[in-house]
Amino acid sequence: MVRELIAILRGVAPHEVVAIAEELILAGITKIEVPLNSPKAYKSIENLANRFSGEAIIGAGTVLKKNEVASVCNAGGKMIVSP
């Protein structure tokens, strides 16, 4: 069952995101956001995109600048959330 939620991995380090995302995906949560004000956010997005391509939609939140959109895309992100 896919749940219509977006999980926000705020403040989570890149080495922690894959294990957390595995549990979220098992629970049916397949949209995962990494806020850009998290530690090494682009690395987290890259780790998630590499591991879960085709299984989940990975993206970034707290996107404030146009150049950040390109950086998220370069890291493999497919979703942008802006305040």
Please place each PLM-identified region on the residue numbering.
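Ordered, amphipathic secondary-structure segments that act as subunit-interaction surfaces
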Residues: 82-83
